[in-house]
Each structure stands twice: as structure tokens, then as C-alpha cells.
């Protein structure tokens, strides 16, 4: 009888772990490929803008060249996440932090790729957490800074959860953002410009920690059951 009660309790805890996740989050993850180089026409127009949903990915591909291309003809960048003012002025020095560094233009394994997951919560103390309905901004500076004022910048809008369709199944869909529908740079009236600051443990909201705690309780109860 005790075993039946324990198994029932374990089932209830497991059910809560599964269904206490954000109901608006997507199951299918879209991946958006961005080729970060000055020859990309979207950067040349200055209106590079993509819309994503929570749990989507941004894949940034760095410039890459054949070995025959001399070093002084290659492009190298440091990419920063900045606030709206930094994006508008293309200035990372006031409110911004380094995200990635494209510093291997002759990488033997192909172009460097960096990925950003637009997640509500991160297990890393210096990770970045994203919120639906807000905008986020990326810019780059050239390495070395030789006086060129060309500014490569990207605006990302995280769509509200009610506009992200929930689907069944787990798979990745990959998009080159050039194939996506053109998006207006005009934000919605309720759009919030997010500050470019990584989240820290004490500042993170506590709601998503509940599934982790429940999972810990589940494992503890399972261990107790096995000792009976």
C-alpha cells in the first residue's frame, strides 16, 4: 500500500514538472542565420531586423576567407549587445557588453558560428534572459579599428507569446533571414527597449525555478522508494 501511495505521489510531482512550464513557449525551435559581414545587403541598408519567439535561435556566421586572401583584406569583428541608444549611435562604449568575437577569418573548419537562444531563463549567472514584447540590439566594431565608420547592426524583436503558435513535436527549422518576410523597423506601441545587461542569479525571476525544485523532490522521493 505504501508503494502505491509513493508511486502516485511521484506521478503527481512528475506531472507538475512537465506542465508547469510556460504555456506560451513553442515546442518547435526556428533558427535564423545571419552572415555578419559588410557584403551582406541587409547590413548595407541599415535595417537588419528579425522577429523571433522564445526558444528560437540566432546563428551568427563570421566572415570566412580562402587562405589565398591576405590578412589585411579580411574582416574581423567584435560583436556587442547594446541598448537602444548604443544601437542608434552604433556605440558600445556606454551601455554594452561583448557577446562574441569574429577573429579567425581563415579558420580551417569553416566560418566561426555563434548561437544565441532566446530563452526566458538561463542557468548561467552571466547568461542573458529575454522577455516577450521587447527589442534587443547587436552591433559590431572592426578589428583592428582602422577608422572605418561602417556600422553593422541588428535589431531583434521577441514577439509576444500569444503571437507564437504552439506546435506539436520537437524539430528545428532553419531560416536565412533574407528569405523571411520583411519586417518594419517601427515597433509596436507596447514595445520595450531592453537594457543590455546580462542577468544575474539574484535578479532572475523565481517562477521557472519551480520545475527544478520539483524535479529534485522527485529524485529524492524515488531514492527513498528504492530503499524500501
UniProtKB/Swiss-Prot annotation:
One of its GO terms (cellular component) is caveola. Keywords: Cell membrane, Developmental protein, Differentiation, Disulfide bond, Glycoprotein, GPI-anchor, Lipoprotein, Membrane, Neurogenesis, Signal. It holds the Pfam family Ephrin. Residues 1-20 form the signal peptide. Disulfide bonds join 62-102, 90-151. Residues 29-162 form the Ephrin RBD domain. This is Ephrin-A5. It comes from Rattus norvegicus (Rat).
